[in-house]
Amino acid sequence: MLMNRIRRWTLLALASLASMATTPALANSSEFETEFDRALGTQARAPKAFAPSYASELERLVALSAEGSRGRIGVAALDLNTGQSVSILGEQRFPMASTSKIAIAATFLEGVDRGRWSLDASYPLLMPMRSQPFSTRVAPVQAGQAMNARQLINIMIARSSNPATDALLRVVGGPQAVNDWAKRAGIKDFRLDRDIATLVRDDGEFDPAVHIDERDSTTPNAMVEMVSGLYQGRWLSQQSRDVLIGAMERTVTGKRRIPALLPENVTVAHKTGSLNNTSSDVGIIRLPDGRTIALAIYATGQGSRLAREQRIASIARTIHDGVIITSPHRISSAR
């Protein structure tokens, strides 16, 4: 009987060695040990436990807040004063939804700085017309009330107006013009494909909690790079920068997201996004002592919009508290 077990173990060993080239080492080890114990009657081993590695204690805490068992959650944050950064699924793509409006506004404002357009010029709102999902490549719109560009930027950011966004998107030349601006700014992993009317009309084709659609998508890392660069005036004049950041500070949407759990003495400039089974918030947190944090949080799934918003609020507070209590001398950059 023992010799039969030994022969069986030998065959298992040879089979395991032969499979190592095509299967993961950990899987081979676990399966081999299980069969070994079964063949020789030895005591089963405790399963191996591997602790995830984090670049800092703050990143570990954010990862706990962003645990995504009920849908993907992507987070990126950067302390503009110290360089401390956090990235949880920061390189994974998420639907931009209305957070893309930051880039659309920036594209128009770059044109203002170059003398192509004026903030005082008026353009009509583009109102969506009734149409069936996917019935046309571009959703039909019609001209509405005319407003000057300064007003359009304010309501497209602060109130997330879709007709105002599409008005300026048409002025700059459509989605490709915005992609070109992002490319000039050196921002990778940013892709705008559709106007807002089409995006909203055709929403629901995929579930972002389990499916990555590269159309109209970005990564949390890319959006943190974008908002930090805009805040620091890297690509726009001071006047244009102030127009955009000022509109973000006046945002009235997403009160249950980034600002929800932050102290009242913290200034928040942000832009929200919402589509089928996804909620997001991207912006700047400015602390009373002058420290400034750029952050982007994209949440999918979680069972409800309220649950996603609660996750976003909790993550934002975790980042805020981590920056407050972490000494710069203990910071480990996670770039």
Residue spans for each PLM region:
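Bacterial N-terminal signal peptides that target proteins for export
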Residues: 2-13
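Structured C-terminal helix/loop/strand segments within mature extracytoplasmic catalytic/sensor domains
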Residues: 27-60, 65, 170-171, 175, ...
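Second-shell loop/turn segments in exported
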Residues: 45-52, 87-95, 137-143, 151-155, ...
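Bacterial N-terminal signal peptides
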Residues: 12-21
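Short, well-structured active-site flanking segments
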Residues: 110-129, 175, 179, 237-240
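A short, well-structured edge-of-sheet supersecondary motif
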Residues: 57-90, 285-286
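Active-site SXXK
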Residues: 83, 95-125, 295
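Mid-domain, small-residue-enriched loop/turn segments at the edges of structured enzyme/sensor domains
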Residues: 72, 145, 153, 166-227
